[in-house]
Amino acid sequence: MSKRMNAIVPNAVALACALTVAHMGSAWAQTAANNDTLKLDELVVTGTASGASKMKQSNSISTVGVDQILQAQPTNSSDILRTIPGVRAESSGGGGNANVTVRGLPISAGGARYVQFQEDGLPVLLFGDVAFATPDMFLRADGSLERLEVVRGGSASTLGTNAPGGIINFISKTGEEPGGSMGVTTGLGYDEKRFDFDYSGKLGEKTRFFVGGYANMGQGPRNASANGVQGHQIKANITQDVDNGFVRLNFKTLDDKSPLFMPAPVSIKNGVLSELPGIDPRKATFYSPYWVQDATLSKNNTLVNSNVNDGLRVKSDSFGVETELKLAGGWKLSEKFRTSENSGRFISIFPGDDVANAASGTKYATGPKKGQAYTGKSFTATVFNTSMDDMGSTTNDVKLSKTFAQADGSKITTTAGLFVNVQKVALTWNFNQYLMEATDNNPALLANSKTNSYGAIDLGTNVWGGCCTRAIDGTYRTTSPYAVLGWEKGALSLDGSLRADQQVATGSYNQASNNQFKPENTQAINYTKNFNSYSFGGNYQLDKDTALFARVSKGAAFNADRIMFDPKKMPLDGSGVVPINEVKQVEGGVKLRNGNLSTFVTLFNAKTDESNYDATTQKSTSNKYDASGVEVEAGYKMGAIRINGGVTVTDAKIVATGLTPNRQAKVVYQLSPSYVLGDATIGAAIVGTSSSKDAQGSGYDVTLPAYTVINAFANFNIGKNAVASLGVNNLTNVLGYTESNDGRMAARAINGRSIKAGLKYNF
C-alpha cells in the first residue's frame, strides 16, 4: 500500500464510522432519549468547582464506566485512555511509563507533562513527566474503580496544577451499593493469572465501607521472565454520613512488579521500519534468565545489585481524608487530603546501538552455551536502572462555595479554594551496557575482547560519555489559591476562574564522575517560580438536548528533573531564569442528543511554549507549537445494540520549522460496538491512527505507519450471578509502532495478540 493510501485510509475509515453512527441515529430518532450513551445529564466532578452535568458545562468531558473499560481489553491503566477522543496515549511501555497528552500538545521527551493523573480528585504525582517515574506507574485499574472522568482543556488550567491540557481522574467506589464480586482471569497461551475482588457493606445506619483490589502473577503476554508479573493492590474507604454531609477515610496499598517495554532493534531504510530476523517488536523485552546481577551505585557510593528481570517495581501506601459539609448561610465546604509514600525501581533494556555481526572471537558469556563460540548478530544492551528513592506526595485541596439567588432570577456561584502540595523527586540513575545476543527469545550475554568475562562493555560513568549516573534529591512545595465565579440565568451560564501557582523548589542534584558521587559535583536546587492561570467559558442550552459552549484558557506545567543536567548548564540555584511550559487554548463546540444518538463535537486551538532536556538523546530543546483540530465523541444505543465512537483530527506544527511534532498523527479514531444476544454479549474496541513522522532531523527520519488495532470480547451470563468472559487484545496481531528513537535503529510497538479467559461471581 502506498504512503498516500496509508494516510488516506484511516481518514476514510474514521469518517465512515462517524457518518454510519449519525445515519443510524437519524433513522431511529423517535426512540426515547434515555439511551443517551454519552450520559450528557450525568453529574461530573472533575475539572469543575461544583458538580454539574456535561450538558450544562463549558468543558469537553468524557466518562468511561467499568463496562466500557472491560470492553476495551486494556493491558495497563493508560491503555484505557486510547478509547477517548482527544487523548493521545502511547501506552506501549508495559506496566507504566506511558506517554500521554491531548489535542496536539507535544510529547517532547516522555510522560504526561500537560495532563494530570488524579485518583479521587487529587494528583497521583504533581509532575507527569519525571523521567523513570510517571504517575501511571502508581495507578492500577481493578475492582475498586467506579469510573473514569477525563477533561480535555477547559478549566483544568485553573482547577489543577500542571494540568493545562487536561485531567484524568480515576474515581473509586465508595460503597453505595451493598454486595461485591470475585473474579479470576488467566492468560491463554501465556502465563498470567489475576484475581480481582470488591465488597461493599454497612457498618451502621449512616456508616458504609468499601474494599477492593487485585493480586496477579506470571510472565505477562510477552512472556518476559519468570515471575515478571507479580503484585497486589488493596484499596478501602469508610464513609460516615452526617446531617450536613459526609466524612470519608481512604486507604491504599500497592506493591507491584511488571515488565517494561523499550524500543526494540529494527531496520530503517529510507524512513521505512521493518523487523529484524529473530526480533519481533510485539513481543521483545530482552528480559532473560541469562542475565547477571546489575551492579549500580547508590547515593552513598555503595554498590547495589539488582535483578534485571524485576522490570518495574513500585510501592505506594497512602492515607486520605475527604469531607463535604453544608454550613450555615448556604455555604459548602469541601476538603480533600492525601499523603502517599511512593517508591520503587525502574529496570529496562534499551538498544544502545544498531544490530550488527558479532566480532570475531565472541563467545557466550552466560546461559547453557557459556564458553561456546558465537557467530550471530549482537547489539549493545543498555540497562536503564533507576531507583525511585522517594516520590512521595502530600496534598490538601480545600474550597468554600456558595450560590446567591438574584432578584432577576439569575444565580451567582462563588468558589474560593487553596491547593497545597509537597512533592518529593528523589531518584538515583545508573546505566550499564552489555553485549547481548540479538534475539527476543531468552537472549544470552556475550563476551569478546571489548567486554569483561560476563559481557559488560561499559559500567557506570563510562556509559554514554558519563551522562547518566545521577543522584536527584528535590522537594517541590506548591501553594495555589484559586477562585471561580459563575453566573447562570435560564439557558445561559458563564464562568471565570483564576489560579496563582507558586512553586518553591529546594534540594540538590549530582552527576557522578569516575564512578563516584563527589561533593564538589553537587548542584543546588533553590528557586521560586510563580504563574497565574485563567479560564473563561460560557454554555448556552438551546433546548434540553442541544447546547453550545466556548472557552479560552491559559495554564502552565512547571519543570522538575527535565531541566537538570542541561548541557547549557542552566543554574537552578536561583541565579538564573528557570523556564515554565505555557499553554494557551481556545475551544468551542456543541453537545447534541437526537433520539438514540448523542454527539459531543469540539473545535480547538492550542499554543505551547516549552523547554526540555531528554536524557536518552541528550538533547536540549526549546520550541513553540501550534495545534488546531476537532474532536468528535458519539454514542448510539437501541435495544441490544450499542456503539460508541470518536475521531480526533489534529493539524499541529513546530512554529519555527513548520514540521509536524514527532509522532503526532493527523487522525486518531475509535469505534466500540457491542451487541446483547440473550445471555451473551459480544463486542469490540477498535482504535486506529494515521501515519506520523518521528526522529526528524536525527539522520533516521522515520514514518510510523498507520495501523488499526482490534480488541474483542465475549461475555456469557451463567445464571443470575456468574459471568464467563473471553477477551482478545490485538485480535489481528497488527504490528503497530508508537515511537522510534533518535540516532539509532530502534522502535517501540504495541503488544501482539493475547487472549485471556475469566470467570466472575457477583454477590
Feature roles, as predicted:
Residues 154-155, 167, 171-202, 212-223, ...:
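Short strand-turn segments of transmembrane beta-barrel domains in outer membranes
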Residues 234, 239-241, 246-320, 345-385, ...:
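Acidic/polar loop-and-plug regions of large Gram-negative outer-membrane beta-barrel proteins
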Residues 391, 410-423, 428-430, 436-456, ...:
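Structural signature of Gram-negative outer-membrane beta-barrels, strongest in the C-terminal barrel
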Residues 39-72, 96-101:
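N-terminal periplasmic "start-of-domain" segments of outer-membrane beta-barrel proteins
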Residues 32, 78-123:
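Extracytoplasmic beta-strand/coil segments of soluble accessory domains associated
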Residues 491, 596-614, 620-698, 712, ...:
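Gram-negative outer-membrane beta-barrel transporters
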Residues 178, 206-209, 244-249, 331-333, ...:
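Repeated loop/turn-to-beta-strand initiation elements of outer-membrane beta-barrel proteins
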Residues 123-152:
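Short acidic/polar hinge/loop motifs at secondary-structure boundaries
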